[in-house]
Amino acid sequence: MSLQEHRLSNGFRIVTENMPGLASASIGVWVAAGGRHETPQQNGIAHFLEHMAFKGTKRRTALQIAESIEDVGGYINAYTSREVTAYYARVLQNDVPLALDVIADILLNPTLEETEIEVERGVILQEIGQALDTPDDVIFDWLQEEAYPDHPMGRTILGASEGVSAFSRSDLQGFIQQHYGPEQMILSAAGAVDHDEIVKLAENLFGGMDAKPFADVAAARFMGGERRQIKALEQAHFALAFESPGYRDAQIYTACLLYTSDAADECVN
């Protein structure tokens, strides 16, 4: 294992692992700007921004963003969680500089055009409606809400229709301005990557960012609870959660092994 780390002068962090024998690489930037970093009024805005990621920048149209990666046989995507928003790509070794340039462009130069905002607003509202009609989605949102009541970790990632309907372009820009700083970002790359090359690319692309302080985030405390809903369905949907060690706890890997042995789908925080 050849894990290497570096931090730029503005706080931007880089973690790489060269994996011999591979001809491709996975690379991405993880931003500490997920659901838990939202205010109640902002609930859903991190996910909204993720939807806007590939809708155009000052240098590339939406089509150019897609074609730049697809034309070299690569894959690019993004996701939002309660902890982070991530932007990542998988490409061949020679296309790593291109992939990182596109990701940096998305992060640093989004145009957030009003027409695209309205299109994505409609898409997200449909997504919210579908989630509310899907018991598998509903029970896990309820689980979070009961585990962390009156806390950002207990809110949904998608947000509520009322809030999403009200987000403006300036709201999106304000969230970026507040949370998308170099110290809030980690560049992670694995596969056919050279650490020194990645550091040099990151310095050129992200080294000019101005540092900004972390926003205050309330500590999450597991509370627990119970919620039931009786509906006329043929199946019952059930979720049960327990407090577990955190990511930084020495017992986290033991806990993950236990979850795996119990046929759990994944190790969750």
Where are these predicted regions, by residue range?
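N- or domain-start disorder-to-order transition segments that initiate the globular core
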Residues: 1-22
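Short glycine/threonine-rich loop/turn motifs
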Residues: 249
